[in-house]
Amino acid sequence: MGSWFGDQGRSLLVGAVTAVVTAVTFYGVVRWQPRTWWLWGWATFTALTALLVFIYPVVITPLFNKFTPLGDDGLRTRVEQLAETAGVDIADVLVADASRRTTTENAYVAGLGSTKRLVLYDTLLRSGSEDETILVVAHELGHRMEGHIWKNLALSSVGLLAGFGALAFLARQSGVWDWAGASGIADLRAIPVLLLFALLAGLVVLPIENTISRNFEARADDIAIELSDSPNTAVRVFRRLGYANLADLKPPAPLVWALFTHPPIPDRIEAVLSRSSGAP
């Protein structure tokens, strides 16, 4: 219970710091450049997004998990060989103590440049065979091979530009700020209007983001099978992950479209079987 409260407290702290930095930066830009604030805001928040990706694995994630280097055993050797084959430079291979709060099995590659590292959940190492772990690692390396992190940063930049442009248009409309009692976007009393705008924009963008994410995940699945040359292992992994992660095996199509960041487990298995059978 103490661990849960600790996690919640740290989450609140991170959220509060993020909110303060966002607000101070936004209003600083608006008051610094009252005519072209939207353009400067786009550039500033694009840079902050890239900075967050860089520092996330060394500043944020250690607040919630303990990380230990993967032992110098056969698995580490295979992981390093696979990364070399994939042409992906990894600064380190770490194990996260995810089991203290979840049964979810996962792995990910985080960071940029010197902060780039591969992280394996201890739940994954305990539940799966070595071949299954390698399949999951191959999937994560597939994301880096395809440059998905850079594509996501580029898409985020486009989304920020569209958002700031729309906000600049609204800011010029009479009456937009009246209900909040604000004189304009630079007025702190405009915050409720800005929060409402952010909420509505997020709802509009979410299905688009998730559709792109599902396409990226499907491509990473393809690369994982190419690297591991083991479609049967992929099927076993997807079945086990579906069970461990409590996945919905028959989600309604509208729900998948709006909320799913990954293809449903049955779709991923079907894609593997279709690929292995040579079907178009």
List where the protein language model places each region.
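N-terminal signal-anchor/signal peptide hydrophobic helix marking the start
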Residues: 187-191
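Polar-ligand-bearing catalytic/cofactor-coordination segments
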Residues: 1-185, 199, 203-280
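Alpha-helical transmembrane segments
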Residues: 193-197
